[in-house]
Swiss-Prot record:
Function: Activates KDO (a required 8-carbon sugar) for incorporation into bacterial lipopolysaccharide in Gram-negative bacteria.
Pathway: Nucleotide-sugar biosynthesis; CMP-3-deoxy-D-manno-octulosonate biosynthesis; CMP-3-deoxy-D-manno-octulosonate from 3-deoxy-D-manno-octulosonate and CTP: step 1/1; Bacterial outer membrane biogenesis; lipopolysaccharide biosynthesis
A GO MF term: 3-deoxy-manno-octulosonate cytidylyltransferase activity
Keyword Heme recorded: no
SUPFAM superfamilies the UniProt entry points to: Nucleotide-diphospho-sugar transferases
Protein name according to UniProt: 3-deoxy-manno-octulosonate cytidylyltransferase
Family the UniProt entry places it in: Belongs to the KdsB family.
Catalyzed reactions per annotation: 3-deoxy-alpha-D-manno-oct-2-ulosonate + CTP = CMP-3-deoxy-beta-D-manno-octulosonate + diphosphate
The encoding gene: kdsB
Transmembrane domains' residue ranges: none
Coiled-coil residue spans: none
Record Pfam families: CTP_transf_3
Amino acid sequence: MSFIAIIPARYASTRLPGKPLADIAGKPMVVHVMERALESGASQVIVATDHPEVVTAVEAAGGEVCLTRADHQSGTERLAEVIERYGFADDQIIVNVQGDEPLVPPEIIRQVAENLAASSAGMATLAVPIESSEEAFNPNAVKVVMDAQGYALYFSRAAIPWERERFAQSKETIGDCFLRHIGIYAYRAGFVRRYVNWAPSQLEQIELLEQLRVLWYGEKIHVAVAKAVPAVGVDTQEDLDRVRAIMLNK
């Protein structure tokens, strides 16, 4: 099975400016992500960025890069520009690998692509079990609930499903029904072309979760438990410091 990995890498991060170029163990962060994607067995790995300095860094590392417009509102829009510029066929499987996940396990990049290939869903993603009440009630940890066939019913920043009897007594413990969504996606190129033409939905604007647009328009999202749990992504300086420490200890 063939798939292409595209890594959106926006330069102007609000909390960590120049994030794709942040040095981790002697390499820019985006290069670490690119190397993980290459290890996944992707037939092609493309970094999609809005900044010439990122282009220079990726090319210096021997990678493939596409300089996109700077006005995209999401990584999916940036990915869609790459799909159009390369002219990928509608049935080509694309994996959207977040540019701020330098420790992403290569096996889950391949896993989400294989899951999509075996499904009729327009999109596939992954999740991991939540084991603490702190994480279940953390709005930055996105929860997902699925149906019997493994398709997403809903994504939320709230604690879903709500354990009525348990939580009526205490919120200190949780059951084994909670899943945290991982922000890695696989789609067919034709699906992305349709997605970017849909108007944003009310639910995604309330929750600030872009994937809810897919459910709003009646499309399916396949969800599976990830074969490996990703380490911390990089949103803040504290995250970057943690990742640097992990890489130094490897």
